[in-house]
């Protein structure tokens, strides 16, 4: 029994979450660049899922899907890093609510150690974009 994930199912769940996030960010009116960043994240995930190799063994299949999920979360955290209006907090709240839905076969369930869920699997790589943004900001402040 191999792992079968529908790309439409993944996008439906993510689209609902992103719509809620974008609505909350739009209400603040100050983080317009977030829209482009999050849509780029969604498109990149879509490209990866569309070009996903279907003939992998089950373990490799799951690792591949989870790496796409990790990349998506790193991308969203990076897109939200410049927005100081609480969008990152809303994103974290959405992730927690999504996990609580307990949808069988969700990426939170399938990838429990990924950047999208608590765990140790990719803790450092998920933190790396935030570190880079922090260091870039610090560097700019030092130069001024």
UniProtKB/Swiss-Prot annotation:
Q: How does it sit in the membrane?
A: Lipid-anchor; GPI-anchor
Cellular component (GO) terms are:
plasma membrane; side of membrane
User: What Pfam family is a match for this entry?
Assistant: NRN1
Chief localization: membrane
Check the UniProt entry and state the signal peptide residues, or none.
Answer: 1-27
> Which tissues does the record link to its expression?
Expressed in sensory regions of the brain including the visual, auditory and olfactory systems. Within the retina, only expressed in the retinal ganglion cells. Concentrated in axon tracts including retinal axons.
Question: Which keywords does this Swiss-Prot/TrEMBL entry list?
Answer: Cell membrane, Glycoprotein, GPI-anchor, Lipoprotein, Membrane, Signal
Q: Which residues form the propeptide?
A: 115-144
As for subcellular location, the record says:
Cell membrane
Q: Which GO terms describe its biological process?
A: neuron projection extension
Role summary: Modulates postsynaptic dendritic arbor elaboration and synaptic maturation.
Which protein is depicted?
Neuritin-A
Q: What's the source species for this entry?
A: Xenopus laevis
């Amino acid at each position: 029994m191999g792992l079968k994930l529908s790309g439409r199912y993944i996008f439906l769940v993510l689209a609902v979450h992103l719509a809620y996030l974008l609505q909350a960010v739009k209400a603040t009116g100050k983080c317009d660049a977030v829209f482009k960043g999050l849509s780029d994240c969604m498109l990149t995930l879509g490209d990866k899922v569309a070009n996903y190799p279907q003939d992998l063994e089950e373990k490799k299949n799951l690792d591949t899907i989870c790496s796409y999920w990790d990349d998506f979360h790193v991308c969203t955290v990076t897109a939200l890093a410049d927005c100081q209006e609480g969008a990152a907090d809303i994103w974290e709240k959405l992730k927690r609510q999504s996990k609580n839905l307990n949808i069988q076969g969700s990426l939170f369930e399938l990838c429990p150690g990924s950047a999208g869920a608590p765990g140790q699997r990719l803790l450092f790589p998920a933190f790396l974009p935030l570190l880079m943004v922090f260091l870039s900001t610090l560097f700019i402040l030092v130069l001024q």
